Regions:
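Long, contiguous binding/interaction regions
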Residues: 1-86
């Protein structure tokens, strides 16, 4: 049986003030992040203060759940974990 496929979605409000806290956690759990995709609205005259991160996680659910709890402890951050079993 293959390992579960773990995907985390992280909604970041006020990216300018929250990005450093989020980045510190992503660095701390860097060995558990296989893929990272950042999305936010941008244009010639504006850049959205909000954003979404999509993370593909590896190396088991325990560390992923720790990351989830730490991200959700930051005011203005909402993280959700989706587990796909094979």
């Amino acid at each position: 049986m293959k390992d579960d496929h773990l995907i985390m979605a992280v909604h970041v409000t006020d990216r300018l003030t929250k990005a450093s806290q989020v980045q510190a956690l992503l660095t701390e759990y860097g060995c558990n992040i296989k893929t990272r995709l950042g999305l936010h609205e941008t244009g010639p005259d504006a850049c959205s203060p909000n954003g979404i991160l999509i993370l593909e996680l590896v190396n088991g659910a325990e560390a992923c759940n720790e990351l989830l709890q730490k991200l959700n402890a930051i005011d203005g951050i909402e993280a959700k974990l989706v587990t796909f079993s094979h």
